[in-house]
Every structure is written in C-alpha cells, then in structure tokens.
Amino acid sequence: MGKNILDTLWLNGSVFENCTMGSIQNTFKIYGMDAAYTIWKEANHTIENCNGNVEKLNQGFLSLKRAFNVASIELRKNLGLDKIRYSGKKKERDFLADLEYFEITKTLTLNKYLKIRNLIEHENETPPPLEDCLSLSEYIWNYIRTIANVLSFFSESILFSKADYPEHEIYFDYVMKAKGKDFFPHLYVTGLVKGKEISFTCKDSFLEINEIKLLNKYDMEKSRYLKSRAHSLDELHSIAFFGEILDQDILAKYVKLSILPEYGGVNERSIQTIFSKI
C-alpha cells in the first residue's frame, strides 16, 4: 500500500512569534525517587560506619548501586531518555552515555567521569576502597536530587496561543508509552492555525510533523484541547491537525531545553531554536 501523501505537514516556525505560553501541566510521579533516597541514605550510613568491615562496605556499595538503579528507572519511565536516538548516539544501550548527553550528570573532569562510571559498572566480588565508595555515594546523592528536580519541573503539556488571534492554538504533549519493560517517549502536536502557515511539501525553517490527521469539526468537538474552537473551521482559512514529531534530534533538543534550567526552559522564544536545523 502506498504512503499517504498527507501523512506529513510542515508548520511555519513564525507561528510561535508573538505567542504567549500557558496551560502547562505536570503530572509526573516521583514516588520512586523517595525510595531511591531511602536506599541511598541507608547505604551511605552503612559505608560511613563500616569500620573496615569489608562485608558491611560491600553491603553499602551494592545498596548504592541499587539506589542508582531505582532512580534511573524513574527517569526512564518518565522521560525515556535512553530511547531517544539522537545524532551521535553510539550504542543502543549505554545509559551512562545518555545521562552525559542530556547533562543529567555533570563531572568536573573526564578522569572523574570514567572513575564514577567504572564504580557503577563494578562487578568484582570485593568492593572498591572506602574512599571510592564515599565518592560514589556523593555522586549518587547528587544524581537523585537532580532527577527529582527534573521530574518536578518537566512540563508534559504546553500551549502556545495568540491574544490577537483566538483561533490560533498549538499544543505539545510529551507522552510516555510502555512496551514490555521499556518506555518510549512521544512528542505529539495538536494545532489550529491559519492555512497559510502550513505546507504539505518540505520547506526550510518549517517544523516537520509526521503521521498527521487533519481534524474536521466533529474531530475538534471530541478533542481534548480544541473542543471550544470547533466553530473556527467555519472559516476556510483555518486548519486543525494532530500529529507527532518523529525527528529524534528535535525530540532531544526539546527535552534538553525542558530539563536544564540554564537553557531557560521552553517558551515562545526558545521553542523556535528547537526546530532550527542550523
């Protein structure tokens, strides 16, 4: 069966100019982070009070790795960073490299990063030295705090609208879907814009949206977002659509901008940089 010629549209990046951002929602659960912190706290106490007892040191070390894994599971479940195939991704399963790419973990030097990585992947029967265990404990404590902050502030739904043109709304939804034991992120777009802002052929500086469905008035009346705007289609210059952004580099930039405070977050200005190919 041939490919539907209308399965992709391109949205003019200028639609975000003079927009205001709102309707931000955050329903991510971070209960697993409480468990990770409890495990870390007990592990750190065990290590600090092992008094040279190798068995206790090993117990604390293994608990540290468990705390890391529990926190990592929450990050995977809520953001799916390990499933984003950004350019330069070298291995399918290299979670530590993904953490480095998305700047979830920051280290001062390459040597320190490699040392921490070796400790996390340590599989010898005997634990690392006490000093290394304490260093790993500090690292994992910061890791847990970072993830808790990321999950607290990440916005899963964002609206861009224009006060001077009510029939202009663009929603982004970051949705996680489970497949077996894996969690995959999806970035969906629901929009109501002027027809002149859309192209069905590729154009530079336009955002590519895939697997689209053009919405009719009946679809809009059932829509989570556009129900109150269904009458807008009575005016032939408006187009409503639903689709997904499949470009993994755009997905990666969207997440980075959303989770890293130093990047300023997603707003009416930064949103355009996400879709820039430059």
Enumerate the language-model features and the residues they cover.
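Short, hydrophobic, well-ordered secondary-structure elements
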Residues: 44, 54-77, 141
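Amphipathic, Lys/Arg-enriched alpha-helical patches that create a basic surface
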Residues: 42-45, 78, 132-183
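Charged alpha-helical initiation segments
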Residues: 1-58, 152-156, 257-278
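Short, charged amphipathic alpha-helical segments flanked by flexible coils
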Residues: 76-106
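Short, charged/polar, low-complexity loop and linker segments
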Residues: 42-50, 90-98, 118-122
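Charge-enriched, short contiguous segments at helix-coil
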Residues: 100, 104-156, 258
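Extended, charged low-complexity segments
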Residues: 228-278
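Acidic, Ser/Thr-rich low-complexity intrinsically disordered segments
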Residues: 163-224
